[in-house]
Amino acid sequence: MNIALLGFGTVGKAFYELTLGRSDLRVTSVLSRRPRPELPCTVTNDFDEIVRDRSVGIVVEVMGGLEPAYRYICAAMRAGKHVVTANKQLVCAHYDELLELARECGVSLRCTAAAGGGIPWLTSLSRAARLDEITAVGGILNGTTNYMLSAMTTSGVDYTTCLREAQALGYAEADPTADVEGYDARRKLVLSANLAFGASVREEEIPCFGISSVEEKDFAAWRELGRVCKLFVRAERHEGRISAFVCPTLFPAASPVAQTNGTGNLVTLRGARFGELSFFGAGAGGYPTGSSVLSDCVDVIEGCPSFYVSRHEAKHIDNSAVAGRFYLRTGSETVCTGPIIVAEAFARAERALSCGEPVFLARIEEE
């Protein structure tokens, strides 16, 4: 099947290389803003040319951002072309609409690379959801912050220096906001919760606290507690309600989560009958992400359904019944709370922030 590739950055290049030599999939056109004389295929800056090309069966979108990616993939589906995307921001923002459009047009929409990098997380999660009731998902789903927290834990380097190192290595973007504030991880949690629970949840309803305010004294305090900090996502379903939040979390130093270092991702699902299943792998990088894009393309030519799940019921996030202990540092005190409702923990942090205080919030995982 012929593929049109939208975007030729790190992931786009890796995906292109992974398709070379295959007889079942061929990149025949690339959408690029500049000429690419090194490529033997058609290179164009006119997307309409791709839409009109009836020989193109799959459009692979690795441009990122909301526009023009949204307009492009909608036009591709309306033209009867399957779509594979790594764009978590886009799929989260237009989840219901894109699923319905794929069904109406009789095409496949796949986004495995949008969560988990090289881990086949979304495909594994959707298969598990067909076998059992999934009651919880959670894990480390952002390679940038995991690299930074790992480095700060082991070497004692400060946040600013560590961020610069991550940017120099290509692990962090020039504007790292989406990663360090937890927004990237939250979007991956939205996709995970939607597939696990057959739901449609809104990103803005999920409370989120990132790592940008972490300080060296926090790591010193955690060492005394025998804990290691990870940016962790979690969502649970109980009696029809869905709870979800993103927050730095303190794990016992010997636990598998605490031992997941570098850009690695570790994510777990819990089934009502089969218990917990965990997945570990590279959470970022051209080839790991490109391999997930390629896997989606193979699924398309093998006749996968239009999307991972057949239903998506709108659900509101309800954290009112979820409690835990928290580490809270403000300008005036550092405390480890007793069990409190998650919503109250985030509210305390927000109140301190509104007063202009420096704040760091982390959940303390029970042993």
Region spans (language model):
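Glycine-rich adenosine-cofactor-binding loop
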Residues: 2-17
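NAD(P)-binding Rossmann-fold cofactor-contacting core
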Residues: 21-39
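Rossmann-fold NAD(P) dinucleotide-binding segment
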Residues: 45-86
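Rossmann-fold NAD(P)-binding glycine/threonine-rich loop
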Residues: 70-75, 88-127
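Oxidoreductase and adenylate-handling cofactor-binding alpha/beta cores
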Residues: 119-134, 145-157, 187-201, 296
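Catalytic, metal-anchored helix/loop core of enzyme active sites in primary metabolism
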Residues: 134-138, 146-149, 153, 165, ...
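Substrate-binding/catalytic subdomain of NAD(P)-dependent oxidoreductase enzymes
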Residues: 161-259, 264-266, 285
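A conserved regulatory-domain signal marking ACT and ACT-like small-molecule sensing domains
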Residues: 297-299, 303-367
